[in-house]
Amino acid sequence: MNDIQIPIIFTDAAAKKVKSLIEGEDNPNLRLRVYITGGGCSGFQYGFTFDDQVNDGDLTIENQNVGLVVDPMSLQYLIGGTVDYTEGLDGSRFVVNNPNATSTCGCGSSFSI
């Protein structure tokens, strides 16, 4: 038996939200891309965008027939993490639960390693 470890978890809640957001679009190839950039109050920040391109080296994870795409540079900071979608009193948003982050800012959108 070959057990392949998926380096990032793409939750059902996140996949369901991505699916609902792209249903009205005219592009069946859209995927949610998560990436890391420098910035924010803690040094790095998460970014989310819809993308219909998968580049060489990108990791694609499928859930509920929708895809999550991560570039190789961002992947090294996200291994073991979870991409989720939450709704609450403070609003609704995609979130990354990242075990590699040693600290995060109050809003949770930036982190340090």
Swiss-Prot record:
One of its GO terms (cellular component) is cytosol. Binds 1 iron-sulfur cluster per subunit. Coiled coil: none annotated. One of its GO terms (molecular function) is iron ion binding. HAMAP family: Fe_S_insert_ErpA (MF_01380). Belongs to the HesB/IscA family. This is Iron-sulfur cluster insertion protein ErpA. The gene is erpA.
